């Protein structure tokens, strides 16, 4: 792990009103995620596709704390009703960019994007080794993702909470998406 890149990402992401948590392993990442969920009194949580080692720990910890966990695959007909009552979404980043503070997520299923876009709280997990320095470095993995998934590729750049300033020219967070975003970086 390059500590300088982690610090640069943290500083930039926090300047965008994102919250960064540094942890040392998957178990600690799941504990941190559940701690955030408890703080937000989340009872219903949606998750996107997550690595098996993290997903298993998260499922166990959510069950221990009485939280309902919606897991993919999602059935499109049920999505609007299901996401109406979800308080938080948990996703996995392909990588993040230290220079911009943006988290980058790849999906090939439109419904998985809802996990990051609809709940009031979004928690994203990423490995410290998946941090890159510059936006220019993002071009190659994005190009490869589109090449490998030409029919239905989605790339999302997530730079903190949703924001708008079209109401009386005042910045308001969380109007069109999450009001709070957390990036949990696993060393």
Which role fits each region the language model picked out?
Residues 1-187:
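The feature marks the mature, well-folded catalytic cores of soluble enzymes
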């Amino acid at each position: 792990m390059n500590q300088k890149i982690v610090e640069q990402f943290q500083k930039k992401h926090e300047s965008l009103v994102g919250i960064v948590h540094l942890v040392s392993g998957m178990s600690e990442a799941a504990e941190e995620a559940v701690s955030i969920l408890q703080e937000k009194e989340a009872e219903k949580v949606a998750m996107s596709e997550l690595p098996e080692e993290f997903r298993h720990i998260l499922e166990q910890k959510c069950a221990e704390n009485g939280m309902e966990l919606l897991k993919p695959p999602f059935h499109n007909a049920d999505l609007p009703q299901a996401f109406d009552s979800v308080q938080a979404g948990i996703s996995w980043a392909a990588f993040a960019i230290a220079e911009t503070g943006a988290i980058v997520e790849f999906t090939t299923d439109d419904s998985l994007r809802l996990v990051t876009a609809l709940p009031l709280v979004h928690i994203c997990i990423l490995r410290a080794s998946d941090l890159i320095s510059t936006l220019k470095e993002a071009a190659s993995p994005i190009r490869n993702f589109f090449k490998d998934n030409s029919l239905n590729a989605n790339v999302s750049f997530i730079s903190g909470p949703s924001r708008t300033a079209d109401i009386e020219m005042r910045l308001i967070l969380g109007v069109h998406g999450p009001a709070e975003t957390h990036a949990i970086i696993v060393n």
